[in-house]
């Protein structure tokens, strides 16, 4: 579901890859001996080293639910933005359900318990000068949006609810299956994608890279909704997520309410290294 991106969203998507580095370094530098000590060290805020010419202020920490959070304060920003990566992608598709991770990316945007309107999120973002999108990669799925700063509070809350209490209404399964299939048909005609498919054919068939990943009406046939919910509960756990937020407010104001929101993301698994 990836289209042209706003520059702010491009920046945030890039910053999410830096979060991987923060998590890796914090783990490597820890010298604590017990699991409790290591968990305490990982949750302690990490000082972000930045250029002396960078006027922004940064805050990075791991929340109690395992989610890694980077908050950026930029008083000069003309837009506010946020992005969240789940470290689960097409490599995690069940062999019998190629394209399930991509299908979940589509279904996640269809309303939440707090904001149940199926298209309410996109309508709110677009009405207030913003944009939103997502993509599914082999090892992660990324969601992002930007919006006019004065509407960022509600925009971020609407965005965050997708990872807290999404509805994933089964009434929209067929609609989103067809949307996924349309992407497949569009890609199928592209020479670049065909070359990519040939590359997959040459791979070890036991490696997930060799598998079909977009999804189609055929691969998403049958009781796909049950498989969808199982995939969500097994993989969309807070300890498999990293989020980055950029807004005009100072960190003293921004950090507490951003932490409060993302602390509600559920921890389905015990904190563990990302598979």
Can you describe what each PLM-predicted range is?
Residues 3-15:
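Bacterial N-terminal signal peptides that target proteins for export
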Residues 36-42, 112, 155, 162-163, ...:
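Scaffold signal of the M16-like zinc-metallopeptidase fold and its non-catalytic homologs
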Residues 43, 81-146, 189-193, 210-214:
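M16/MPP (pitrilysin/insulinase) zinc-metallopeptidase core fold and M16-derived inactive scaffolds
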Residues 52-80:
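Mature N-terminal segment immediately following signal peptide/propeptide cleavage
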Residues 167-185, 250, 270:
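Acidic/histidine-enriched alpha-helical segments
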Residues 268-275:
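Conserved small/polar residues in nucleotide/adenosyl-binding loops
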């Amino acid at each position: 579901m990836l289209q042209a991106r706003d520059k702010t969203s491009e920046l945030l998507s890039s910053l999410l890859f830096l979060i991987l580095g923060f998590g890796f370094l914090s783990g490597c530098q820890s010298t604590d001996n017990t699991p409790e000590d290591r968990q305490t060290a990982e949750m302690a805020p990490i000082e972000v080293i930045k250029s002396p010419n960078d006027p922004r202020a940064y805050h990075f920490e791991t929340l109690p639910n395992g989610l890694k959070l980077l908050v950026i304060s930029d008083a000069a920003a003309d837009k506010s933005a946020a992005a969240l990566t789940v470290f689960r992608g097409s490599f995690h598709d069940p062999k019998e359900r190629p394209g399930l991770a991509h299908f979940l990316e589509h279904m996640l945007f269809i309303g939440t318990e707090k904001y149940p309107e199926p298209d309410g999120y996109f309508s709110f973002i677009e009405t207030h000068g913003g944009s939103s999108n997502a993509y599914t990669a082999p090892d992660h799925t990324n969601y992002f949006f930007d919006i006019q700063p004065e509407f960022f509070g509600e925009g971020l809350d609407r965005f965050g609810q997708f990872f807290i209490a999404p509805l994933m209404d089964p009434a929209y399964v067929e609609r989103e299956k067809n949307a996924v299939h349309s992407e497949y048909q569009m890609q199928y005609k592209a020479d670049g994608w065909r070359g990519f498919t040939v590359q997959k054919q040459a791979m070890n068939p036991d490696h997930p890279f060799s598998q079909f990943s977009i999804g189609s009406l055929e691969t998403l046939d049958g009781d796909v909704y049950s498989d969808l919910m199982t995939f969500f509960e097994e993989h969309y756990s807070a300890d498999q997520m990293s989020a980055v937020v950029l807004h005009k407010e100072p960190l003293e104001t921004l950090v507490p309410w951003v932490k409060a929101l993302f602390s509600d993301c559920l921890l389905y698994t015990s904190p563990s290294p990302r598979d």
